[in-house]
Amino acid sequence: RFKKIRRLGALPGLTSKRPRSGSDLKNQLRSGKRSQYRIRLEEKQKLRFHYGLTERQLLKYVHIAGKAKGSTGQVLLQLLEMRLDNILFRLGMASTIPGARQLVNHRHILVNGRIVDIPSYRCKPRDIITTKDKERSKVLIQNYIASSPHEELPNHLTIDPLQYKGLVNQIIDSKWVGLKIN
């Protein structure tokens, strides 16, 4: 993971750890003129590694975004940000996106009162995201919320930390995307 972070820059969803600062010297020696191909490839890889997507999943999202009205890049980021695993990460219910994927896969998360075990589930406005009533699920989420640094919550989400409940208010604005994409 650190190799990816050193090569591509900050990927907040991949891991909460940070590489040592002395490793940037190698990158400065290697950096020369970056071709258009390299720039595009790095931006694509940033998206893949940050959101934990396979090549095929990313291609499907690009295809959907291309058919939609508006800027393809903005629509693509909106689609990726409205995934259930990413919303759990943004709410602070998981420290990383892979951690959020694990919570969803292990059936700890309910959307509108129903168990959802698909991390790529596309959330819609007015979806209510809660934890299962089991004690183990609540303890897991409580630990994540307590240990995570309290960052500013995006406008499109609200959280009730006492009831372990999150609400999707609207589709995300482009300024709230936590990843810098060229």
From Swiss-Prot:
Q: What GO biological process terms are annotated to this protein in UniProt?
A: ribosomal small subunit biogenesis; translation
The record ties this protein, via NCBIfam families, to:
PRK05327.1, rpsD_bact
Protein name, per record: Small ribosomal subunit protein uS4c
Q: Which SUPFAM superfamilies match?
A: Alpha-L RNA-binding motif
Compartment(s) where it occurs, according to its Swiss-Prot or TrEMBL record: Plastid, Chloroplast
Share what the entry says about its subunit structure, partners included.
Answer: Part of the 30S ribosomal subunit. Contacts protein S5. The interaction surface between S4 and S5 is involved in control of translational fidelity.
Q: Which Pfam families match?
A: Ribosomal_S4, S4
UniProt family annotation: Belongs to the universal ribosomal protein uS4 family.
- Give the record's keywords alphabetically: Chloroplast, Plastid, Ribonucleoprotein, Ribosomal protein, RNA-binding, rRNA-binding
Q: Which gene encodes it?
A: rps4
Q: Which InterPro entries match?
A: Ribosomal_uS4, Ribosomal_uS4_bac-type, Ribosomal_uS4_CS, Ribosomal_uS4_N, S4_RNA-bd, S4_RNA-bd_sf
Molecular function as annotated in GO: rRNA binding; structural constituent of ribosome
Domain S4 RNA-binding, which positions? 82-143
Function in brief: One of the primary rRNA binding proteins, it binds directly to 16S rRNA where it nucleates assembly of the body of the 30S subunit.
Primary location group: plastid
Q: Which GO terms describe its cellular component?
A: chloroplast; small ribosomal subunit
Name its species: Neomarica sp. (strain Lejeune 1997)
